Amino acid sequence: LTRTGTTYLHELLGLHPETRSHYAWEQQHPVPTTDDESASAQQFDRERRYKEGRPRFEKGQRIAGDYFQRIHKICYDASEECTVPCSVEAPWNASTLTFMVCSSEKLFDYSLGQTYQLYSRFLQILTWQAPDLASTWMLKCPFHLPYLIELHATFPDSPLIWTHRHPCECIP
């Protein structure tokens, strides 16, 4: 995919106090591990998951290397795109994406209705855990493009922003 500035736009829109994106650390450990529903227990659990997930994230960063970070910076506690939580059964997870690039028509054979339903539950879990944060979710993933009908069916009230650069202007 050509670089269209979606990461920069995502970061910019994420500065607005009424929007919220999920963070990389929340993608690793979205579900509380305690049965205690009190606010203090939930906060303690959230902080513990945050702290315990950092070494795994940093290991992934070392494996990905500086080149990937220059293309798409990922921070542990900053807005992140929805590639990871949607990749449970979507065709763009790391193990299948390289094969799909070779035969991109297969991308259109998938139905992501169930994936988006699971993603909606993921967002509900995060909203429940941090009700004091902004409630307007901002989603970002370039792989949504072939599945806009299913995305809209799951999130019917969500506006879509499409960034575009003409290929002749961005590819030498």
Segments the model singles out, each with a brief description of its role:
Residues 3-4, 130-135, 154-158:
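Short, well-ordered loop/turn elements at secondary-structure boundaries
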Residues 16-23, 130:
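A generic secondary-structure signal for well-formed alpha-helical elements
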Residues 4, 146, 169:
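Short alpha-helical
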Residues 12, 122-129, 151-157:
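Generic, well-ordered alpha-helical scaffold segments in large soluble proteins
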Residues 1, 138-142:
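Short His-Asn-centered micro-motif
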Residues 26-137:
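PAPS-dependent sulfation machinery
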Residues 1-19:
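Glycine-rich phosphate-binding P-loop
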Residues 140-141, 150-172:
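Conserved phosphate-donor/acceptor-positioning beta-strand/loop module used by diverse small-molecule
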